[in-house]
Amino acid sequence: MSPLASKALRPAATDPASIRNFCIIAHIDHGKSTLADRMLQMTGVVDSRSMRAQYLDRMDIERERGITIKSQAVRMPWELDGQTYALNMIDTPGHVDFSYEVSRSLAACEGAILLVDAAQGIEAQTLANLYLALENDLTIIPVLNKIDLPAADPDKYAAELASLIGGDPSDVLRVSGKTGAGVEDLLDRVSRTIPAPVGDPDAAARAMIFDSVYDAYRGVVTYVRMIDGKLSPREKISMMSTRATHEILEIGVSSPEPTPSDGLGVGEVGYLITGVKDVRQSKVGDTVTTAARPATEALPGYTEPLPMVFSGLYPIDGSDYPDLRDALDKLKLSDAALVYEPETSVALGFGFRCGFLGLLHLEIITERLSREFGLDLITTAPSVIYEVTSEDKKTVTVTNPSEFPGGKIVSVSEPVVKAAILAPKDYVGTIMELCQSRRGILLGMEYLGEDRVEVRYTMPLGEIVFDFFDNLKSKTAGYASLDYEPAGSQDSDLVKVDILLQGEQVDAFSAIVHRDKAYAYGVLMTGRLRELIPRQQFEVPIQAAIGARIIARESIRAMRKDVLAKCYGGDITRKRKLLEKQKEGKKRMKMVGRVEVPQEAFIAALSGDTEKKAK
């Protein structure tokens, strides 16, 4: 057994040969964070008393949902054959929406632990993360987790994993993050096989920013991986992309609580605090160098994450608009992938059009806005980016249905993605049926082992971003897993469906849908609004239209007073006169009356399963 390191190596004085930088990559729910907990405990960084499950997941939302959203970096000491190593572990998210977090973490590592659940086997996200790691030339250590489960079948999945990455099934380590079995062997394997970082200690300092978070008291905390040279406290540093200079107020390592040090040397992973309040000053992927002796060449950065899904966020109370702006600014600090710009809607007032990486990202951001900042928001139905070419050859980029141009349209192109779905072979039929109903085109199928299939489709992103994942899970009893990547765009027969209330368009309910599904969407929305809008003194028609053509209609019946109540018996002409008079009044009222759509109706219509249009 490897003993606890008698003393940890001091940051800034650590020989790069004793540093090991690695991350844990796996599909969602395969036990990354639990394994990280055991490592923290076994290396003695966190004592048993202050240990809690998912120690590194700091956000309430992460803990409640049991998912990791932000990567975390931790330095741990480990002793092997009389030599002490400094292991820098980066815990990464497993969800497809946060793959950019994973790619950033991989760029700061030399090795990766590929973790697979011994009861579930390889899943879509396992493959996606593995390919990311291979692109970064990382040394991969295959590991099966959860071997203590009664349903675990380590021999079968060890063979599957070995055939996937090439190697012998006996090389696949078997651990249990829950009981701690095999974790020491894993730490030994990490120390032995992951290459030490390479860098020039005498060159000009270069450090890569792989994450930055905002701390209310200390400003922006920037996580960096040193490549060359050394950084020390009170040194002036410069960001290579913005040329901004700052002074390092504090520099140190997370282990796992922030621990100040005398600096950072080659290959080390740590944090900097410069007292800057604007996170845009420390962009993820940027290179940090010293102002006195700047490096000439920046490190190759990452590609900026591109938003895939757009949605409007509007405060329910218009006076909260400045608070919403501040809240988004603060979230942007710790979430580089969030993009937003102000927009106004006739129906909803002032708000922001925000770009997200996917639906989970959208859900997490809206939940954080309501929790951390106490905002009540309306979220409009998510949409993707369309390129619309009109007859005069002008191309317009549309992220919001209200920007869809009128007049003759030559073509509309929408983004498509390559989707890979992994599931047990019994569900292939239902999966294909679902994908075809969403305009998917089959690319191919592959059997992984005797009972699991990978089905590959190209599909329009607009069909995936709503409820595709939920439907996929419910049709496959929760066994299927999905991964997708952008694959260009294609021209499609898309139309904008407007919802008219008493002949007036309500922009918040407009949607861009495929022509075949336009009627279903129109019927769904008009039916839903009929239930939600309160009855008026006059009849209110609710119509769905494509351009000037009405495709569906519902009416809200008028409320009417019983004007005949006072006539007891009496002549029919008297009754007719009163009824005609009432009818006349209703007609006049209809001409001048306006329909107020209550806030609740907006929320219910937009948040309800507005997207059941694909049924």
UniProtKB/Swiss-Prot annotation:
Binding residue positions for GTP: D29, H30, G31, K32, S33, T34, N145, K146, I147, D148
Gene Ontology MF terms: GTP binding; GTPase activity; ribosome binding; translation elongation factor activity
Protein localization: Cell membrane
Protein name: Elongation factor 4
Keyword ATP-binding: no
tr-type G domain span: 17-198
Origin superkingdom: Bacteria
Pfam family, one: EFG_C
EC nos: 3.6.5.n1
GO biological process: positive regulation of translation
InterPro entries found in the cross-reference section: EF-4 (IPR006297), EFG_III/V (IPR035647), EFG_V-like (IPR000640), EFTu-like_2 (IPR004161), G_TR_CS (IPR031157), LepA_C_sf (IPR038363), LepA_CTD (IPR013842), LepA_IV (IPR035654)
